[in-house]
Amino acid sequence: MKPMLKDFSNLLLVVLCDYVLGEAEYLLLREPGHVALSNDTVYVDFQYFDGANGTLRNVSVLLLEANTNQTVTTKYLLTNQSQGTLKFECFYFKEAGDYWFTMTPEATDNSTPFPWWEKSAFLKVEWPVFHVDLNRSAKAAEGTFQVGLFTSQPLCPFPVDKPNIVVDVIFTNSLPEARRNSRQPLEIRTSKRTELAQGQWVEFGCAPVGPEAYVTVVLKLLGRDSVITSTGPIGLAQKFGYKLVMVPELTCESGVEVMVLPPPCTFVQGVVTVFKEAPRSPGKRTIHLAENSLPLGERRTIFNCTLFDMGKNKYCFDFGISSRSHFSAKEKECMLIQRNIETWGLWQPWSQCSATCGDGVRERRRVCLTSFPSRPGCPGMSLEASLCSLEECAAFQPSSPSPLQPQGPVKSNNIVTVTGISLCLFIIIATVLITLWRRFGRPAKCSTPARHNSIHSPSFRKNSDEENICELSEQRGSFSDGGDGPTGSPGDTGIPLTYRRSGPVPPEDDASGSESFQSNAQKIIPPLFSYRLAQQQLKEMKKKGLTETTKVYHVSQSPLTDTAIDAAPSAPLDLESPEEAAANKFRIKSPFPEQPAVSAGERPPSRLDLSVTQASCAISPSQTLIRKSQARHVGSRGGPSERSHARNAHFRRTASFHEARQARPFRERSMSTLTPRQAPAYSTRTRTCEQAEDRFRPQSRGAHLFPEKLEHFQEASGTGGPLNPLPKSYTLGQPLRKPDLGDRQAGLVAGIERTEPHRARRGPSPSHKSVSRKQSSPTSPKDSYQRVSPLSPSQCRKDKCQSFPTHPEFAFYDNTSFGLTEAEQRMLDLPGYFGSNEEDETTSTLSVEKLVI
């Protein structure tokens, strides 16, 4: 009975269920939950019941977002389908939240309304799970790190409008627990946009928040405020920690470098400690060998090799941050360090010098410190030696030789020393030999005859007529002395020197002798000696009662060549009475006396005789010295036959000319003053010169005067007066005699008359006016001299022009052309021309005409 009752109960239940289910309407979800952004699809089952009258209805299912009540999508059911399953794709669920599925029927015929009914279902959507990770970037030293985003949920492949996510990173300098008692923490936010991916790394830069940094990562959907996931804050020091970078094994030479790699966005600040890892008993503390502190921002430190033992040992290094941190980060790294000692120790003190005196050697040593004594490898020398110099040894005590001193440099030094000394001696000997050869190897150039009757002037200088200087050189192309006088035909022997024809002059043989003579004579004769001599003679004439005299000087560019020349030649006197000798003592003699006649049986005087005659003293103190060339070449030149005529023995050089210099014209000067102190010297010199003239006058030889030349001479000497007839001493074969005083005065009248037109034209000079008052009678005898025309250097070099007689044979010579030119007449006083003192009262003005006292 019981089993039959049980079966009936089951049948009844089935019938009841069929009735209920057949008439019910519903909307059911297969899965109550869903994951947003995932690739899962949402399935919804539905069923609805048709009415009894069989009216058709339209049924739709809506997907609504519960928070905003917005419709996401709508799906319609078929009219003939009362039950089934609807599929909603994954791309409808982009965001986590609550969703509603609602089924709503719609009537097709509005005439028959029916009551509204509605079925719904609830769906909860969640975010997928993303794992956030932090990592060091490859550019950790530049302050960057990486954020990793990973999920295990398969993501929906959005065909269109794929959503993007935003990663926010927040940097802080403290933990939330520490913010209660401190100020507002520093917070720096940075964001990056990225695509939706199942796994990816996003790189971020560090923010300067301080030595400690904390990071919070937030993942959001772009355009939405909902947060997909959030991680943090994460301490970067705890996350990454500090790392000690070193090699596992090294050989220590100078030091061991340890580098600390800090966490990203964190500055290093701590202490690096080194200790030796060795087995120790339990409870024994590790001994630290050294500690190096790292300042803020520094990453490297070096430990010296002297801290480590020799050989190979294991040492460990650890790094600890400052105690202010909320956590204690310890990083430990160990490594094997091999230390091989191969270095020099300290130098030992210097040893004593090897010698007690002189040069010695001292040395010092050092030891190589190495781990392998069998094969030391220290570079360099273990022994060093140096020279030591002590007190010098005595001459008999030789210095001890140095055993370690190299011999090569010493020998080379000795060779250099000997060579230098030899070279110096050679130079000294050569200098001495050259000096001796130049002093004694050359012949004497000048032979100066001494004069015993020379009287010095009060100024302690020798006068120009006190000494004859012989210059051994040939005559220059100018007026010459003695044997180098102007040449002419043999028939010109009887003509006075002032009337002879000029001729060619032999070339100069030795110019150096003339220059040497002039330079030596400058040291003996004062430049203006001739002018002072004229003043002395003038004073002597005043004392002796002489009233008038005239002197003509040839003034050249050099004071050595100033020469006084009488204005007109006078015949020599036969003899001198004592009165005449006393009068002639202060009378200026002509430097051009006529040449004595030579007898027919005798030859003309040779050059040697003429030179000997020239070597005598000068007649006038104002005359120049004798050239050395006359004595040097007198033996090599021929006699008068080689020249065109014989030269006067008393002919003296009157001027020296040079082409490059401008000639100074000759001026006629008066002898203004004569100091009383020089009068005795002058008289003594006059007597000495007369004695020398007589001594050197040739006795056995004379000059021949031919008859025709004697006639010319008589015509040239004048037309009337005492000088017209030839004196008896001028006959052939008779020696010449001195002209007396009367003949000389009478022969000079013509010279006085020729000077009068010039005086009348220019007027008397001041000296003439003052002197003319003292004249006792106009007919008193006067010593007058004829003026000699001045010559330019070029004329004297080319022609040696001189006056010639008025004989028809000499008619082509114009005697008037040898007078003074206008330029010479316009010349002012000679002392001003030579730069003398015009304010001297004893100096008279020099003029070009005869002056009368």
Swiss-Prot record:
Record topology, Extracellular segments: 25-414
Domain TSP type-1: 341-394
Disulfide bond annotation, renumbered to this chain: 353-388, 357-393, 368-378
Protein location: Endosome membrane; Cell junction, Focal adhesion
Entry keyword set: Cell junction, Disulfide bond, Endosome, Glycoprotein, Membrane, Phosphoprotein, Signal, Transmembrane, Transmembrane helix
Annotated stretches, region: Disordered: 445-518, 624-650, 668-702, 714-800
GO biological process: focal adhesion assembly
Gene3D superfamilies assigned: Thrombospondin type-1 (TSP1) repeat (2.20.100.10)
Signal peptide: 1-24
Bilayer topology annotation: Single-pass type I membrane protein
Compositionally biased tracts (Basic and acidic residues): 687-697
Transmembrane stretches, start-end: 415-435
Pfam family, one: TSP_1
GO molecular function, one term: extracellular matrix binding
Glycosylation site positions: 39, 53, 58, 69, 80, 135, 304
Phosphoserine modified-residue sites: 464
GO CC entries: cell periphery; endosome; endosome membrane; focal adhesion
Biased segments, Polar residues type: 671-686, 767-795
Topological domain spans for side Cytoplasmic: 436-853
Alphabetized InterPro entries for the sequence: THSD1, THSD1_D2, THSD1_D3, THSD1_N, TSP1_rpt, TSP1_rpt_sf
Protein role: Is a positive regulator of nascent focal adhesion assembly, involved in the modulation of endothelial cell attachment to the extracellular matrix.
Subunit structure: Part of a complex composed of THSD1, PTK2/FAK1, TLN1 and VCL. Interacts with TLN1.
Protein name in the entry: Thrombospondin type-1 domain-containing protein 1
Source organism of this protein record: Pongo abelii
Gene this protein is translated from: THSD1
